[in-house]
């Protein structure tokens, strides 16, 4: 615990950086997770699922 304190919490700049890095990592994980939930709930109703019915194949 002492090493964690000396590495992150003792210096305000390092602490703020750790908070921002943690928030960024959480945002990425949350966003990806919610996208997967949304895609699962709306499977077959999104443009990416029905595009092949309306767009002709490119040559």
UniProtKB/Swiss-Prot annotation:
Cell location:
Mitochondrion inner membrane
GO CC term, one of those recorded: mitochondrial inner membrane
Mitochondrial matrix side stretches: 1-15
The record's listing under InterPro entries reads: QCR9, QCR9_sf
Provide the membrane topology annotation: Single-pass membrane protein
GO BP, sorted A to Z? mitochondrial electron transport, ubiquinol to cytochrome c
Q: Mention any Pfam family matching this sequence.
A: UCR_UQCRX_QCR9
Q: Which Gene3D superfamilies match?
A: Cytochrome b-c1 complex subunit 9
User: Mitochondrial intermembrane side of the membrane: what ranges?
Assistant: 42-59
| Transmembrane intervals | 16-41
**Key words, A-Z:** Electron transport, Membrane, Mitochondrion, Mitochondrion inner membrane, Respiratory chain, Transmembrane, Transmembrane helix, Transport
On subunit structure and binding partners, the annotation says: Component of the ubiquinol-cytochrome c oxidoreductase (cytochrome b-c1 complex, complex III, CIII), a multisubunit enzyme composed of 10 subunits. The complex is composed of 3 respiratory subunits cytochrome b (cob), cytochrome c1 (cyt-1) and Rieske protein (fes-1), 2 core protein subunits pep and ucr-1, and 5 low-molecular weight protein subunits qcr6, qcr7, qcr8, qcr9 and probably NCU16844/qcr10.
Similarity field = Belongs to the UQCR10/QCR9 family.
- Cross-referenced PANTHER family, in alphabetical order? CYTOCHROME B-C1 COMPLEX SUBUNIT 9 (PTHR12980:SF0), UBIQUINOL-CYTOCHROME C REDUCTASE COMPLEX, SUBUNIT X (PTHR12980)
Q: What does this protein do?
A: Component of the ubiquinol-cytochrome c oxidoreductase, a multisubunit transmembrane complex that is part of the mitochondrial electron transport chain which drives oxidative phosphorylation.
Q: What is this protein called?
A: Cytochrome b-c1 complex subunit 9, mitochondrial
Originating species:
Neurospora crassa (strain ATCC 24698 / 74-OR23-1A / CBS 708.71 / DSM 1257 / FGSC 987)
Gene that this sequence comes from: qcr9
